[in-house]
C-alpha cells in the first residue's frame, strides 16, 4: 500500500487492456501474403488436421491464420485478407482468413451460412 506522498509523486498506473488481435493494429481486416500453408493437430479432447497458414501482413507482422470451411485453394504467395477471431483448439492461432476475398476462393457447394464462407448463390 503506497503512502500519500508516494501517490502524489508517482500516482496510480492505469491498467491497459490486452488486445485479442494486436497484429491488426485496430483495423477490422488486414491484407497479407501466405508464407506457408500446412495442417496442425488440435488440443487434447479434439482430433483432426486443421488447415492453417503462416501469413506476413502488410504491416510486416507474421501471424498464424486458420483457414475455415471444407477445402481451399491457398498456396505459398497467395494474397489473403485476414480478420481477428481465435480458433479455440489451436494454440497461438488468433486470426482467420476471409473466404471469397482476394486470392481465397469461397467454399464450393455451400448452401447454409454462405456469407461466412464467401459462397455464391447456386
From Swiss-Prot:
- InterPro entries reported for this sequence: NA-bd_OB-fold, Ribosomal_uS12, Ribosomal_uS12_bac
Q: Which Pfam families match?
A: Ribosom_S12_S23 (PF00164)
- Subunit details: Part of the 30S ribosomal subunit. Contacts proteins S8 and S17. May interact with IF1 in the 30S initiation complex.
GO CC annotations, alphabetized: ribosome; small ribosomal subunit
Q: What does this protein do?
A: With S4 and S5 plays an important role in translational accuracy. Interacts with and stabilizes bases of the 16S rRNA that are involved in tRNA selection in the A site and with the mRNA backbone. Located at the interface of the 30S and 50S subunits, it traverses the body of the 30S subunit contacting proteins on the other side and probably holding the rRNA structure together. The combined cluster of proteins S8, S12 and S17 appears to hold together the shoulder and platform of the 30S subunit.
| Species lineage | Bacteria, Fusobacteriati, Fusobacteriota, Fusobacteriia, Fusobacteriales
Stretches that traverse the bilayer = none
- Enumerate the HAMAP family for this protein: Ribosomal_uS12_B
Q: Which family does it belong to?
A: Belongs to the universal ribosomal protein uS12 family.
Gene encoding the protein? rpsL
* Key words of the record: Ribonucleoprotein, Ribosomal protein, RNA-binding, rRNA-binding, tRNA-binding
Species of the source = Fusobacterium nucleatum subsp. nucleatum (strain ATCC 25586 / DSM 15643 / BCRC 10681 / CIP 101130 / JCM 8532 / KCTC 2640 / LMG 13131 / VPI 4355)
Name this polypeptide is given: Small ribosomal subunit protein uS12
**Gene Ontology BP term (one):** translation
Instruction: Locate the region Disordered.
Output: 12-31
Q: Name one GO molecular function term.
A: tRNA binding
